[in-house]
Amino acid sequence: MADLEDLKTALLSDIAAAADESALEAVRVASLGKKGSISALLSGLGKMSPDERKTEGAAINALKDAVNTALSARRGVLKDAALEARLANETLDVTLPVRPQGAAAGRIHPISQVMDELAEIFADMGFSIAEGPDIETDDYNFTKLNFPPDHPARDMHDTFFFHPDKHGRRKVLRTHTSPVQVRTMLAQKPPIRVICPGRTYRCDSDQTHTPMFHQVEGLVIDRSSNLGHLKWILEEFLKAFFETSTVNLRFRPSYFPFTEPSMEVDVQCSRKDGEIRFGEGSDWLEILGCGMVHPNVLRNCGLDPEIFQGFAWGIGIDRLAMLKYGMPDLRAFFEADVRWLKHYGFRPLDFPSLASGLSP
């Protein structure tokens, strides 16, 4: 028992001395991990007699509970301290007087800038902008786009669903801007040539994914558009956006419910010293998905696939910004850090065009 008391004193002392969450995690692993000191004691219970096991087991479990309680309490203290330090570091006094003339001007967020670039480039190719609501019906987000009832995208782990209404119908936060294409085809007759930029939502969060992100999709519907036209549009867009005289694209067969055939598009690039350059090199980078609009989607939108055809594509706006302007972590886009915006933001009077994109 004396050994357990000594171990308890040592562990509680280490927990109290942990200066940050990584140090605290090291103490937890050293005590409660698979090879930790308390875990070793618990594994040795099987070698004891029933009476010893009863006495020692109760004491070891009490030690384990005490350590878990101390870990939880210390973790809360460290999280509070980290939050206070961050708030103190980012505090802005909004009561300060207006900055004098000549002070640094505000900057345009990279997402806003890239959306402006997309609008300008595609406008030069005759596209208009179509928009729709962020909260969509299941019908527009899935059914009219030819998603089968058992498609994984309809699961809770991938889509944000609202509670059902009194009729049992559930609305969703749109998972793509494709519902805008549906609304466009229902509202107007071909020829159609639109891009659909906007916010989209999925249950995902890591260095390259966030629960809310931005996407732009394009749609062309008429009587004769084909994959050759799609290839030309994508090449011209990527050349203008990445400001290169040439791009080489690789089309790979893929599957999307709303297009047939469906393709993933890779762009040729080189990677050197952390920099990606397009139009050269031996590497390939996946950049977007596309395909010919599925006949079922046309029928669902009141268009005869025997008369009309067309193509569509989709690409992540946040990903475009990261690739063009060298931003490593998508999560920083939405942390409202003025210092980050000052570094990556843009001046208000810069304008892109089809002939030239816009680099800082």
Swiss-Prot record:
It comes from the Bacteria. It is an enzyme of class 6 (ligase). It is found in: Cytoplasm. It holds the Pfam family Phe_tRNA-synt_N. It catalyses: tRNA(Phe) + L-phenylalanine + ATP = L-phenylalanyl-tRNA(Phe) + AMP + diphosphate + H(+). GO terms for cellular component: cytoplasm. GO terms for molecular function: ATP binding; magnesium ion binding; phenylalanine-tRNA ligase activity; tRNA binding. Binds 2 magnesium ions per tetramer. Its main location: cytoplasm. Mg(2+) binds at residue 260. The keyword Manganese does not apply. InterPro entries: aa-tRNA-synth_II (IPR006195), aa-tRNA-synth_II/BPL/LPL (IPR045864), Phe-tRNA-synth_IIc_asu (IPR004529), Phe-tRNA_ligase_II_N (IPR004188), Phe_tRNA_ligase_alpha1_bac (IPR022911), Phenylalanyl-tRNA_Synthase (IPR002319), tRNA-bd_arm (IPR010978). Its cofactor is Mg(2+). Keywords: Aminoacyl-tRNA synthetase, ATP-binding, Cytoplasm, Ligase, Magnesium, Metal-binding, Nucleotide-binding, Protein biosynthesis. One of its GO terms (biological process) is phenylalanyl-tRNA aminoacylation. Its EC number is 6.1.1.20. SUPFAM superfamilies: Class II aaRS and biotin synthetases, tRNA-binding arm. HAMAP family: Phe_tRNA_synth_alpha1. Tetramer of two alpha and two beta subunits. PANTHER family: PHENYLALANINE--TRNA LIGASE, MITOCHONDRIAL, PHENYLALANYL-TRNA SYNTHETASE. Belongs to the class-II aminoacyl-tRNA synthetase family. Phe-tRNA synthetase alpha subunit type 1 subfamily. This is Phenylalanine--tRNA ligase alpha subunit.
